[in-house]
Amino acid sequence: MTKTRPDKRLITVRRGIIAFVVLTVVIVGGYGLFRSTAIDVSGEFVEGTHYKVIDGAPPVPISGPIRVTEFFSYGCIHCRNFDPMVNDWLRGAPKDVAFERNPVVFSPAWELLAQAYYALQATNALAENHDRIFKAIHDNGKQFLNAEMVADFVNGHGVTRDAFLAALDSPATQRAVAEASRHERASRINSVPSLTVADHYAINMDSVPRKKAFDVVDFLIAKIRAERAVTSGSAPH
């Protein structure tokens, strides 16, 4: 059987198509890389992508500490993994920032953990037990089904069992949990961990890597400072 010579024109057309496809891939890929790195190089973050304005949020206060809030629950494994990053940021947090943790009450079990948070805060035993509770639940599989189980766990760790239960049942703790729930709803929180700045901006935790979340927080803090400086006519600090 004899071989037929390939049509030179067909070969040329095929090579042209392949070259066009390769060039298109390079251009599109390069453009995508440029867009993804341009934000990192400039240090800019984009509203709608990295953060958003909370629906119905009040205006950013024109003075006073800039409030940064972490919404979390001891029952959330992602919050447990995020907590070291929160602590790292807190060690160098700006002096004009007021940071707070806001436990969410997505379920009765998480409401109990929110009550425990404020009871420990009221008895000055939060620092000693905050990480212990995270580890007990997520590293050791411990369940806290009622207040007595939490009281037994924290007993002797900065607080007595009776003092903890008294604080947990107090009107002050109930008010704190109610306010935390109100703040959660006003901030449109439906997943944790979540971060808000000045009760006006929310970090898009679904699109921002956890390790970059506080970069967006710092960006928004700087943005608020700059806007305040323009309003007051002074240079931002």
Enumerate the language-model features and the residues they cover.
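Extracytoplasmic/secreted envelope proteins and their assembly/folding machinery
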Residues: 83-90, 113-117, 130, 147, ...
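Extracytoplasmic thiol/disulfide redox context detector
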Residues: 2-111, 181, 222-237
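A short alpha-helix capping/helix-coil boundary motif
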Residues: 6-7, 66-67, 94-97, 128-131, ...
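Alpha-helix N-cap/helix-start motif
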Residues: 79, 109-110, 143, 177, ...
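Structural microenvironment flanking redox-active thiols in thiol-disulfide oxidoreductases
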Residues: 92-123, 127-155
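C-terminal cap of thioredoxin/glutaredoxin-like
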Residues: 2-23, 156-237
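Solvent-exposed loop/turn segments at secondary-structure junctions
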Residues: 75-77, 105-109, 136-140, 172-174, ...
